[in-house]
Each structure stands twice: as C-alpha cells, then as structure tokens.
C-alpha cells in the first residue's frame, strides 16, 4: 500500500504542460483561484507519479479516466499488471494526499480544522446537524472547548468522505446512514490508528477498515479500505488494530513530484497567461477533490 501527502507549493510555468490538456478542466481553471487549482493539479501529478513508478507505465502512456461519479481510475486498456489496482486522492488545507492499494478498494480524505467562515461554532454545528447521527454529535460535543469539538467534527467528516470516495457514489449518499464509533478520541501526530469502526444502517461493516492519521496539528487524514470479493489479500479485519503503528505518510517535495515527469504537450505560453490572469475567488473551507 502507498500513502503520499504533498505540501502544496505554488506551481511554475512548466508544470501545466506536463499534466496534459485532457487532464485539466480548462473551465475549472478559469473559475477558481490559483491556490485552489494548484492542489488539484498536484493530485493529478501524484497519480501519474504513482502509476509511472509503481506500475512501470511510461508517463506519457498513462491514460486516466473518471467513473460516472467522477472517481479517477486507470483506463481499462492500460498495461496494468494489477486489475484491482485502486487509488484515490484528496486535497484540502495545506496538503494533497494519495492512497493506493494493489488489490483493495480504497478512499482517502483530508480535512483541516479551521473556524467556519461565518457565525459561531454552535451555529455552524446547527447548520450541519443532519450530517451526523445523534451518537456522533454526542462524541463531538463531549469535549469542553469548542475548538476540540471542531477538531472532532472534521475528523468525523474525513471518515465519512473516505468511505463515500472508496465506494464511488458521489454526493447523493445519505450521511446519516453512516455512524462511526471513533477510537481513540485523541490522535498523536505521525501515528496510524485503526480502531475506529463503521456502522452502516445500524449494522457493523466488518469488511471495512479505517486508518486515521494526523499529519500535523490541524490536518486529519482518513483512509477507508475494503477487500474486494475474490481477492487473495489477507482479510483487513485480521490485522492487529489494538495499537497504533508507525507507518507514516511519505512526504513529497515538488521536486519529488515531478522527478519522473515528461512533457505531454508542447509548452503553450498563452495557457500559462490564462492560468495567471484568473481573478482569485475566496474558497470555502470545505472545497475538496
């Protein structure tokens, strides 16, 4: 398995033609700010780096597609030795993250704890009331100070998003169908925890495992993993989940990210000019990939 976070820098002119025009939504680039587009571009570069270096597919032969619900996948005609190879990306706050599995179904989400853009934390919780079950709200509100409550809110949110992204159903999934029994309540930076359990429609989902991490003081990462039917991989529930592990994310620099990159198209100065010309638009905290 592979877990890769990337601290997001500003992109240079040469980056854009490395990604390739078919993998960049030009309309999206125009609509949003550079700070939002940069992690989205980073996510695409992370996928290409992963596929090129782990599956030995030449960078310029990599063909990516999206499912009907928008999840990025390798094209079926790719020279892929792992037919169940699965990956997922997320970006929010200061990081873009990627999780990949050779056989297991996987989803990843990252959330940064920050104050709501408008109103108080209790007002924000009231607006989001229907996103969590009563038991989840009890856990969130069990802490005395509001900042720690907000921490737990975003940790719960990352868990739900990781599951939804793993199954690839998009925005139509009713979040209250999911209930997480979170354990432990406090996470140490750099540790990986696998004790949290998922209940779907009141029934425990034992085929699913959740890896929780804190990259730093403000960023939670949740990885959802499920064994597909017919897989020879060991059962995910057979692992010892009683203790945190030291398996940390591999931190990439920008130079790491593009170390194996090759240009996909001739450099187009007008494309870069268009990229830089876009007016910056304030982005709400919940913007995701």
Please name every model-derived segment.
Residues 1-289:
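Core catalytic alpha/beta fold that binds nucleotide/phospho-ligands
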């Amino acid at each position: 398995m592979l877990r890769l976070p990337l601290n997001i820098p500003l992109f240079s002119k040469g980056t854009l033609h490395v990604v390739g025009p078919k993998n960049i939504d030009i309309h999206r680039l125009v609509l949003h700010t550079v700070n939002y587009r940069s992690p989205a571009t980073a996510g695409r570069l992370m996928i290409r780096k992963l596929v090129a270096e782990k599956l030995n597919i030449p960078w310029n032969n990599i063909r990516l597609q999206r499912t009907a619900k928008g999840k990025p996948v390798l094209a079926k005609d790719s020279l892929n030795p792992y037919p169940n190879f699965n990956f997922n990306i997320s970006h929010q706050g200061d990081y873009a993250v990627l999780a990949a599995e050779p056989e297991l179904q996987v989803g990843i989400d990252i959330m940064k704890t920050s104050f709501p853009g408008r109103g108080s934390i209790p007002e924000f919780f009231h607006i989001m009331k229907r996103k969590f079950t009563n038991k989840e709200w009890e856990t969130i509100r069990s802490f005395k100070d509001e900042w720690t409550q907000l921490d737990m809110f975003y940790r719960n949110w990352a868990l739900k998003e990781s599951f939804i992204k793993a199954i690839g159903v998009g925005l139509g999934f009713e979040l209250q169908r999911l209930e997480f029994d979170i354990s432990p309540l406090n996470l140490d930076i750099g540790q990986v925890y696998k004790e949290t359990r998922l209940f779907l429609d009141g029934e425990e989902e034992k085929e699913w495992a959740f890896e929780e991490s804190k990259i730093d003081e403000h960023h939670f990462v949740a990885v959802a993993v499920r064994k597909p039917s017919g897989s020879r991989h060991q059962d995910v529930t057979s692992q010892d989940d009683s203790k945190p592990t030291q398996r940390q994310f591999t931190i990439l620099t920008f130079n790491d990210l593009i170390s194996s990159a090759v240009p996909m198209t001739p450099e187009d100065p007008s494309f870069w000019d268009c990229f830089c010309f876009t007016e910056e638009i304030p982005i709400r905290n919940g913007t995701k990939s």
